[in-house]
């Protein structure tokens, strides 16, 4: 919270609290007009940490209200009206290897090396999506993006790492098939990464979980 004179400026006043205030201020005017089609306000929470509130909200709307014909989202978007937004998916991929001493790599399965192959493939997928971009698209950038945000693994420099965790995500164009992109990654892991790990031990492998 920042105070300047008689005004207090908390985080999120433009994105999204300003739009909430604007909509509620217009509610009396909407009521006076006796609209034939109702307008519903849907307020959620915790968008930045995985859209935690919206899941229950969508379930409640589906069960208790007619499906909406249109949705107005109060994102600031630099104060410009836009006709759509990219979707978002986030994932956690955990590679389980077989630990051992670095002097005997043939006796273990290196989780970080396997994770590195997955990271490189994510970059390959991103390249394909970028090369297929429509230059006339209103989106910036005009293609589905893949973000590799966090990687963690290993215990010591002389130990074959047993675990490697990769956190990655996608911002998907409305015209793209998110399931197909996700499936491409899962297929690569199943066909190109896991067999090498399981050749050392059946307990090694890769698990990818969608986190939102």
Language model segments and positions:
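Acidic/His- and Gly-rich active-site-bordering loop/insert found
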Residues: 1-13, 30-35
């Amino acid at each position: 919270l920042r105070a300047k004179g008689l005004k207090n400026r908390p985080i999120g006043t433009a994105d999204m609290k300003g739009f909430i205030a604007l909509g509620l201020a217009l509610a009396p005017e909407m009521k006076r007009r006796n609209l034939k089609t109702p307008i519903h306000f849907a307020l959620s929470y915790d968008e930045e940490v995985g859209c935690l509130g919206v899941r229950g909200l969508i379930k409640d709307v589906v069960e208790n209200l007619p499906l909406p014909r249109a949705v107005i989202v109060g994102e600031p978007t630099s104060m410009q009206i836009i006709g759509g937004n990219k979707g978002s998916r986030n994932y956690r991929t955990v590679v389980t290897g077989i630990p051992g001493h670095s002097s005997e790599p043939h006796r273990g399965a290196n989780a970080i090396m396997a994770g590195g192959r997955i990271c490189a493939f994510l970059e390959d997928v991103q390249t394909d999506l970028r090369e297929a971009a429509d230059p006339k698209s209103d989106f910036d950038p005009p293609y589905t993006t893949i973000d590799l945000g966090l990687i963690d693994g290993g215990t010591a420099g002389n130990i074959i790492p047993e675990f490697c965790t990769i956190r990655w995500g996608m911002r998907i164009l409305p015209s793209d098939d998110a399931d197909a992109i996700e499936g491409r990654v899962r297929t690569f892991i199943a066909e190109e990464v896991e067999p090498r790990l399981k050749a050392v031990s059946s307990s090694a492998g890769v698990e990818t979980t969608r986190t939102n």
